[in-house]
């Protein structure tokens, strides 16, 4: 009986609600002091801090937010927001929704960028946002110093989702990749998807990839055909061209656990080219 209780205790410890959370501590920064208490927000209270944006964060499996404010003798301040999401992919998702593709990117965490009075970065399951006030000409230096110390306290920096390396490089707009967690293209039956924007010879288009198991992929194809009133043939792996009333003609390919496709392109040769390039990229990922 004691052995059973011990095993159950270990299981509860490993899989309990706090198993994924690190014991994060805000860093000490020379010349700065924390002002007031650290604020903590959970899913049901997040709206108290970011009312208008809370729903978007919750879509990406937000778990917890910790907020600290620092002041110096010159009455400048830095506010550090540390958002924890359920997985690194979810953290990337919300980060990708807010980053600007032409931002001033820096080597911090998995990726980060700095603008006037703002520094945001991604590291593991954490999305960190820093805002500065009255920091003057030293603003960027101050933000970088804070970011490095916060990143060190969070530990391993992680990396961007590996599947992003499968996207063809030719024509891809740098840092345009996004992760859509739910309702891709506005359809509840389409699971989460990674996307990237492209431009080639004046033609702008988008590539996407959805990852599931074989049954999940088959169900998505079948429901998409039903939704668009497309002819329902024997659902099998291969190429599909779907006339979507909201998104135009979409060409996609299903193979194994992936569905990948292309949007906003009428040139069939260009579609074929990029679907093949994408297939090659996914093969390398295996």
Residues of each region from the PLM?
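Positively charged n-region of N-terminal signal peptides that target proteins for export
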Residues: 1-5
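Soluble, non-membrane globular domain cores that form compact, hydrophobic packing
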Residues: 9, 13-286
């Amino acid at each position: 009986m004691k052995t059973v209780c011990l095993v159950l205790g270990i299981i509860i410890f490993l899989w309990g609600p706090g198993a994924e959370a690190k014991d994060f501590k805000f860093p000490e920064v020379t010349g700065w002091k924390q002002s007031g208490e650290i604020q903590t927000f959970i899913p049901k209270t997040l709206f108290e801090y970011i009312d208008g944006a809370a729903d978007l964060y919750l879509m990406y499996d937000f778990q917890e937010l910790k907020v600290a404010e620092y002041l110096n003798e010159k009455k400048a301040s830095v506010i550090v927001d540390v958002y924890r999401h359920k997985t690194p992919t979810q953290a990337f998702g919300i980060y990708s929704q807010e980053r600007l593709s032409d931002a001033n990117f820096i080597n911090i965490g998995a990726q980060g960028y700095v603008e006037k009075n703002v520094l945001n970065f991604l590291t593991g399951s954490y999305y960190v946002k820093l805002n500065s006030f009255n920091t003057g000409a030293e603003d960027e230096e101050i933000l970088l110093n804070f970011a490095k110390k916060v990143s060190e306290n969070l530990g391993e920096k992680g990396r961007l989702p590996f599947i992003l390396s499968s996207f063809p490089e030719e024509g891809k707009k740098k840092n345009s990749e996004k992760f859509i967690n739910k309702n891709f293209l506005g359809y509840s039956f389409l699971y989460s998807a990674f996307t990237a924007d492209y431009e080639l010879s004046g033609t702008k288009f988008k590539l996407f990839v959805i990852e599931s198991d074989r049954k999940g992929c088959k169900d998505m194809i079948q429901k998409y055909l039903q939704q668009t009133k497309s002819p329902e043939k024997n659902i099998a792996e291969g190429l599909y061209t779907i006339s979507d009333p909201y998104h135009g003609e979409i060409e996609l390919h299903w193979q194994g656990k992936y569905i990948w496709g292309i949007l906003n392109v009428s040139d069939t040769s260009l579609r074929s080219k990029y679907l093949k390039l994408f297939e090659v990229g996914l093969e390398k990922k295996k």
